[in-house]
Amino acid sequence: MSGMGENTSDPSRAETRKRKECPDQLGPSPKRSTEKRNREQENKYIEELAELIFANFNDIDNFNFKPDKCAILKETVKQIRQIKEQEKAAAANIDEVQKSDVSSTGQGVIDKDALGPMMLEALDGFFFVVNLEGSVVFVSENVTQYLRYNQEELMNKSVYSILHVGDHTEFVKNLLPKSMVNGGSWSGEPPRRSSHTFNCRMLVKPLPDSEEEGHDSQEAHQKYEAMQCFAVSQPKSIKEEGEDLQSCLICVARRVPMKERPTLPSSESFTTRQDLQGKITSLDTSTMRAAMKPGWEDLVRRCIQKFHTQHEGESLSYAKRHHHEVLRQGLAFSQIYRFSLSDGTLVAAQTKSKLIRSQTTNEPQLVISLHMLHREQNVCVMNPDLTGQAMGKPLNPISSSSPAHQALCSGNPGQDMTLGSNINFPMNGPKEQMGMPMGRFGGSGGMNHVSGMQATTPQGSNYALKMNSPSQSSPGMNPGQASSVLSPRQRMSPGVAGSPRIPPSQFSPAGSLHSPVGVCSSTGNSHSYTNSSLNALQALSEGHGVSLGSSLASPDLKMGNLQNSPVNMNPPPLSKMGSLDSKDCFGLYGEPSEGTTGQAEASCHPEEQKGPNDSSMPQAASGDRAEGHSRLHDSKGQTKLLQLLTTKSDQMEPSPLPSSLSDTNKDSTGSLPGPGSTHGTSLKEKHKILHRLLQDSSSPVDLAKLTAEATGKELSQESSSTAPGSEVTVKQEPASPKKKENALLRYLLDKDDTKDIGLPEITPKLERLDSKTDPASNTKLIAMKTVKEEVSFEPSDQPGSELDNLEEILDDLQNSQLPQLFPDTRPGAPTGSVDKQAIINDLMQLTADSSPVPPAGAQKAALRMSQSTFNNPRPGQLGRLLPNQNLPLDITLQSPTGAGPFPPIRNSSPYSVIPQPGMMGNQGMLGSQGNLGNNSTGMIGSSTSRPSMPSGEWAPQSPAVRVTCAATTGAMNRPVQGGMIRNPTASIPMRANSQPGQRQMLQSQVMNIGPSELEMNMGGPQYNQQQAPPNQTAPWPESILPIDQASFASQNRQPFGSSPDDLLCPHPAAESPSDEGALLDQLYLALRNFDGLEEIDRALGIPELVSQSQAVDAEQFSSQESSIMLEQKPPVFPQQYASQAQMAQGGYNPMQDPNFHTMGQRPNYTTLRMQPRPGLRPTGIVQNQPNQLRLQLQHRLQAQQNRQPLMNQISSVSNVNLTLRPGVPTQAPINAQMLAQRQREILNQHLRQRQMQQQVQQRTLMMRGQGLNVTPSMVAPAGLPAAMSNPRIPQANAQQFPFPPNYGISQQPDPGFTGATTPQSPLMSPRMAHTQSPMMQQSQANPAYQPTSDMNGWAQGSMGGNSMFSQQSPPHFGQQANTSMYSNNMNISVSMATNTGGLSSMNQMTGQMSMTSVTSVPTSGLPSMGPEQVNDPALRGGNLFPNQLPGMDMIKQEGDASRKYC
């Protein structure tokens, strides 16, 4: 024990000494007690001090021993001094640390007081130590919370394996100075430590991967977390022990708080090198890669695509133009170009290029381009997700084209209106069509119409369009879209909707949306569109919905629609006819009214009007678009338009309409000056055209005058002349409140776009117009009629927009059909003119119920004018547009424009429209139909819509039209519109009220004809004769043309002539909503029995609709087998229409199907339209809606893509596909692009498959002949039955082109080709059961066409499947692998044939072929394969189908398979 010499600082020793002394002192001494207490406290504090002092990183080595009091105090003094020095240094902005070896911690940056909290803040981050070599010598356990790595995974690993490549340098810079600086620390003093903060990106362990080392190579696909590291470097000189810790970097890493995160530059850039020819030789995206912004690869890809793609209307792409400038100037900046990313984000890009010359020869060597990109997050399109919403909101106005429509359809007009509304129309339309369909469908008809078209059109790079000039791009790219200004984004938005915004593609809903925005914002700029949308919305909210869509849609539509296709052109006329505002608002509707002049509507309306048919129309369309744009920006024209619209509106409907029209126009344009001006121009053009039509109907001189007026005077003249009529019309509307309400509903339904909100106003306008039509007979009357048509869209529109077609058709039908259709109107009028007038009057009367056509001459003139312009544009439009991917538009056109041809037949104008709408409807049958109906006197859309909503109410307004619409719509949309048909029935009675029973008959006839025609068209001879050949030759142009004019007129006439009676019979069925099935059956029988029906169908565009829906309808048309067989060949293409028609007809057929024949099999459509009749194929029904949507989308795409003969066949399948696809919910999500691409593939395959079909069908026939019966095992692949029946739908869904069970059934019928298949395979047999016999019958009925028949069989199934050719084919093939197996060759052949029958069918065929091949049933081997090969486990087992189902991809292989066949 030591003496006094002992270190008293040593607590243990002091205590020992005390204890020794204690015995000497027996009693506790207060002094000693105090001393002891003090020493204890001293020791306690010294210990605490030691803990504090040695808690620093620098003293980490000192933890090995316990320092004595003296050392502790000494260290404390040092640290206090250091702290003071640090404070001084901080004041002097010196970032030096204490100079003492045992300096506290790198507190140069972090105070001692802050160190503890910072260390605790490790809760916010993790702690790690890195040595000089970059190895992680220690890492805290909570690293898992940040990087997902476990502590063990990172220990002794290289820190660079988790650091972003771009941060390695920064990290090394922080590591080396501390570790390598032998004295050269940040301050340059060897013994000092430096602490600093830097940011770096650390790899987050991929969920699947457990090792971080493999991530470097995956960097592009890895996720990095931005971390803020507080690092303290420890120089070697400080290290006394623990070599491992020498020269190490001690870091605390925490996530960078959002507020502290550096705002990433909104601009990004990448560089490319091009040779002197402009070809890209290298691409450097390192800067974008380092920025780690999401989607940069897509950004680069789309930027290059946009920059190097030659755009419509431009001779050179941006890249070529820019390259020329660079070569010429050495340095050049490109213009700013825009495009959309897959997520809908708008990007503005500019390219700066420099010509690099050789330093020696000074010769140009290459061009280096810097592409600067700026993401415009807040522009029209937010994200693909927001695109539907953001865009949808702007579109809302556009969609506002049918706010009511949106309300009906979409519920939330703003967001997905285009998508929701459009997609809803197609998707929901089919089922909702029954109740709301009209509103949504009819009202949104244009939208829907557009939807269907757009569904197909979205193929175009809508997103790009949106960026550029949505109005132009959208219309040009998406003709259908242009037409459906209201639902530009529609599917899109299947999407658009699909994915409404379906990110990537132009086809994506997003694309659609973009496009729609563009369309709506005729200015061709999303912002304009947005403004227009807002204005339109405002106007709509104010009740000025009329011009809204119009202005938005119209300018674009005008320019774009005209350009897009007859449909596009027609829609503006319809709008015009429907109402100045409506037409403007709803380019689609407005155009049909101007149908005659619709083509010229934009700016070439007069010209179009005069020579609207043919090339003039497309040219006019483009011209209109150009002019339209200039006019759009022509405030003067806009003012005139406003005046005209206002005057017209005021006169037509002083209170709401005037403001509605003008306001709507303004709103819809966003502002008269801006989009408004475009809209105004469009309206002005439409008004001019309307007046021209009105006056033109009187005489060419009047037309010229009108044209002149339209150019300058028309504003006032038209205003004045139309004003009276308009006023009258408006007055009449008020006169009949019920009518007004009906009109409102009808108008809303009919005029989705513009009439959504302004519908009531417009409808009143229509009514009043009708009412005043009598007073203001003559030019005013005509004008009023036109206006009324514009306003009402149904009767008036049809007469106006379809006046030409109507006139022609009336001429054709007057002898046979018109008298029957309109016996009371002009039963005794032998002259076509009289008949036409009578029909027009009828239509007008139907619309105005109370005012029978007072001025026959005026009406006649109007009809004539419209028809003439309509007819002319129609053929030209159809022909021109069809070639231009306007098949869908064509269909749409036919719907609207077709309203002319169709209405003449159907309603003498209204009815005609219905089939076409049906066609369109199948394209966008349900939605389109309403549109068509609206366009064409709202036959389908309007009548349908009205019947759906206020069938009775509307009936008075335009009973005939409504009824016709209803009937037609019913026919078209039977399944979906069971209610609609019933409404039509109601409409018919109403019609009967307003007009004699004959009208009812007419409606009934029309209805019957509509459905029958649609179906008959699909299957009827008329369909086959005209549709088939034209379709085959010129898929839609010819089909449409025949449908449009002569074909339609003559055929319709016959069908009407014969079918009126038959139709009259069905009419009662139609009258009884519950008897829709019977009515359909009757209609079908009636239509089926008349060759004239074929013509009617054609005139109505039913053949095309049938083509579209033929595959699906084939079964339905078992009764029509012969015609179907014939049709299926042609209808294969016509079936695009067919499928559209079938969309409507699907519902229609379901009613008919059960009674008609194997139409029961038609459940495909039934499924589509079966909603009203769950009985047929509820499953299919649900899917049908998506199918309809898809059908519309696909139909458009296919129509555009299948404008050629291929297109006709493809159309059939395509439309069927569309129909089926819309029916399949899964379909809806499919990108428009995918559809478009598929359709393209199908088109390509279709040509091959068409040939293949014939070959395959022949083979199939041969195989059948050979008895290529699939053994039960073949058919048996139980998977088949299951897959076919249930999977049918699921399969369809699974297939992405989920075809309704009908598809499976349809496909089953294909198997039906092989007689054995049906009985052998439960799936096959049930499926075959429906489809097979009809199909087989049809196929057998037409041995020559047998391949097509088979195709038809397939077309029915395959068509059903066709809709989802790829999908269907797989389900078909997957499940039907058996089918393929059982009918191996047959299936392939049938499949092929069917596919040939329809676009999808083609694909299916191809798919089946490939499927068959996949199923190891080579096409060639299929026959030989027979039951035996079918017995192959692969083939026989459900596996075959399962495999094939998965093999849906095989469908993709279809092309190859079909190629093989080819």
UniProtKB/Swiss-Prot annotation:
Transcriptional coactivator for steroid receptors and nuclear receptors. Coactivator of the steroid binding domain (AF-2) but not of the modulating N-terminal domain (AF-1). Required with NCOA1 to control energy balance between white and brown adipose tissues. Critical regulator of glucose metabolism regulation, acts as a RORA coactivator to specifically modulate G6PC1 expression. Involved in the positive regulation of the transcriptional activity of the glucocorticoid receptor NR3C1 by sumoylation enhancer RWDD3. Induction: Expressed in a circadian manner in the liver, brown adipose tissue (BAT), white adipose tissue (WAT), heart, skeletal muscle and suprachiasmatic nucleus (SCN) of the brain. Shows a higher expression during the light phase compared with the dark phase. Residues 26-83 form the bHLH domain. The modification Omega-N-methylarginine is found at R1259. Present in a complex containing NCOA3, IKKA, IKKB, IKBKG and CREBBP. Present in a complex containing CARM1 and EP300/P300. Interacts (via C-terminus) with CREBBP. Interacts (via LXXLL 1, 2 and 3 motifs) with RORA (via AF-2 motif). Interacts (via LXXLL 1, 2 and 3 motifs) with RORC (via AF-2 motif). Interacts with APEX1. Interacts with BMAL1. Interacts with CARM1. Interacts with CASP8AP2. Interacts with CLOCK. Interacts with DDX5. Interacts with ESR1. Interacts with HIF1A. Interacts with NCOA1. Interacts with NR4A1/Nur77. Interacts with NR4A3; potentiates the activity of the NR4A3. This is Nuclear receptor coactivator 2. Ubiquitous. A motif (LXXLL motif 4) lies at residues 878-882. The modification N6-acetyllysine is found at K636, K640, K780, K785. It comes from Mus musculus (Mouse). The keyword S-adenosyl-L-methionine does not apply. Residues 1-11, 467-487, 658-671, 1309-1323 have a biased composition (Polar residues). Belongs to the SRC/p160 nuclear receptor coactivator family. GO terms for molecular function: aryl hydrocarbon receptor binding; chromatin binding; nuclear receptor binding; protein dimerization activity; protein domain specific binding; RNA polymerase II cis-regulatory region sequence-specific DNA binding; RNA polymerase II intronic transcription regulatory region sequence-specific DNA binding; RNA polymerase II-specific DNA-binding transcription factor binding. Residues 1-40, 467-513, 557-636, 648-742, 1051-1071, 1309-1328 are annotated as: Disordered. The modification N-acetylserine is found at S2. Acetylated. Deacetylation at Lys-780 by SIRT6 stimulates its ability to coactivate PPARA. The modification Phosphoserine is found at S29, S487, S493, S499, S554, S565, S682, S699, S736, S771. GO terms for biological process: cellular response to Thyroglobulin triiodothyronine; circadian regulation of gene expression; circadian rhythm; locomotor rhythm; mRNA transcription by RNA polymerase II; negative regulation of DNA-templated transcription; negative regulation of smoothened signaling pathway; negative regulation of transcription by RNA polymerase II. Its main location: nucleus. Disruption phenotype: Animals show a glycogenopathy resembling to Von Gierke's disease with impaired growth, fasting hypoglycemia, and an increase in concentrations of triglycerides, cholesterol, free fatty acids, ketone bodies, uric acid and lactic acid in the plasma during fating. They also have increased liver glycogen stores and hepatic steatosis. A motif (LXXLL motif 2) lies at residues 690-694.
